[in-house]
């Protein structure tokens, strides 16, 4: 993974960053999301200081990330429990089913 410079327009400024080329599109998307969230925050609340709007948006995004991580963790636990239940069911079925031995004769 070689890093290449990418130019992003963010809050009226040009930022030059290095990141792997295959991540350029994702970084552009992230910058666009952050830019729109900060602009929306400033418009909605009347906050004039970019730093304050950035701090609030960063806090909101961090909160959203934590919420998603908690959801993912709960889903993983549910899936793990279902896998364990299915495994027990299959083991029970396997133990109660008589195995048949195939007999072959070569003429």
UniProtKB/Swiss-Prot annotation:
Record protein name field: Cell division protein ZapA
Subunit structure: Homodimer. Interacts with FtsZ.
GO cellular component terms, A-Z: cell division site; cell septum; cytosol
Gene name tied to this protein: zapA
Location(s) in or outside the cell: Cytoplasm
Entries under InterPro entries matching the protein: Cell_div_ZapA-like, Cell_div_ZapA-like_sf, Cell_div_ZapA_N
Entry keyword annotation includes Cell cycle: yes
Family of this protein: Belongs to the ZapA family. Type 1 subfamily.
Purpose: Activator of cell division through the inhibition of FtsZ GTPase activity, therefore promoting FtsZ assembly into bundles of protofilaments necessary for the formation of the division Z ring. It is recruited early at mid-cell but it is not essential for cell division.
Stored Pfam families: ZapA (PF05164)
Coiled coil: 21-42, 71-96
Cell division listed as a keyword: yes
Main localization of the protein described in the UniProt heading: cytoplasm
Sorted UniProt keywords: Cell cycle, Cell division, Coiled coil, Cytoplasm, Septation
GO BP annotations listed: division septum assembly; FtsZ-dependent cytokinesis; septin ring assembly
UniProt xrefs under Gene3D superfamilies: Cell division protein ZapA protomer, N-terminal domain
